[in-house]
Amino acid sequence: MRAVTRISAVVALLALVGTTAARAQHPQVREGFWIGFGFGFGSLGLSCTGCSSINRESGISGFLKMGGTVSDKLLLGGESNGWTKDIGGTRVTAGNLSFAAYYYPSPAQGFFLRGGLGFASYQEQGQSGSVGFGLTMGLGYDVRVGTNFSLTPVANWSWGNVGDAHSGGIVIPGTKENVFQVGLGFTWH
């Protein structure tokens, strides 16, 4: 829990410090192709048919996004969100690959809401992976620090219904995964 508090404080501080100066020097202009990536803290939760409560696991998370600008308020693109951790000597990964929309309520500001749908995955090292329907949503703020570059603090949530997962040779029926993510991204507009 300490890691979440520290990362949240750093992200909030970066957003506060950079917002005022960046707004005056580099206006929020969104047009054409955009691309970005980022890293941060993630918390994975699992549920399954007939399972008792499964504890959340904290780990490293990241994302990659790219797409095109539809208007000064709407961006459309594709993104990949991932989470990973070594648990008891086994590498566990979860992720989403989505078609996503980014909505900026006020075009002159950097605040945005995002949502997407696509595919989710879950895999434990040495086992076959599970893939199913996935959703993602979140919010963030593009802190413009250059003409075409922003630091982008984000808070995201992704969910997936990955079906039957495999753990240590055992089939886990009806597995659903979700990841909460807090991170810092780098975006080129």
Segments the model singles out, each with a brief description of its role:
Residues 89-122:
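Helix-adjacent hinge/juxtasegments
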Residues 39-45, 80-86, 93, 117-123, ...:
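Transmembrane beta-strands of outer-membrane beta-barrel pores
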Residues 49-53, 85-88, 121-128, 167-173:
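Extracellular loop and loop/strand-boundary signature of outer-membrane beta-barrel proteins
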Residues 23-85, 163, 177-189:
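Short glycine/proline- and aromatic-enriched beta-strand/turn motifs that initiate or cap beta-hairpins
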Residues 72-76, 108-113, 146-151:
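Repeated loop/turn-to-beta-strand initiation elements of outer-membrane beta-barrel proteins
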Residues 37-41, 62-68, 99-103, 117-119, ...:
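Residues on the lipid-exposed face of transmembrane beta-strands in outer-membrane beta-barrel proteins
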Residues 31-33, 56-62, 91-97, 109, ...:
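Residues that define the transmembrane beta-barrel architecture of outer-membrane proteins
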Residues 1-29:
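Cleavable N-terminal export/targeting peptides
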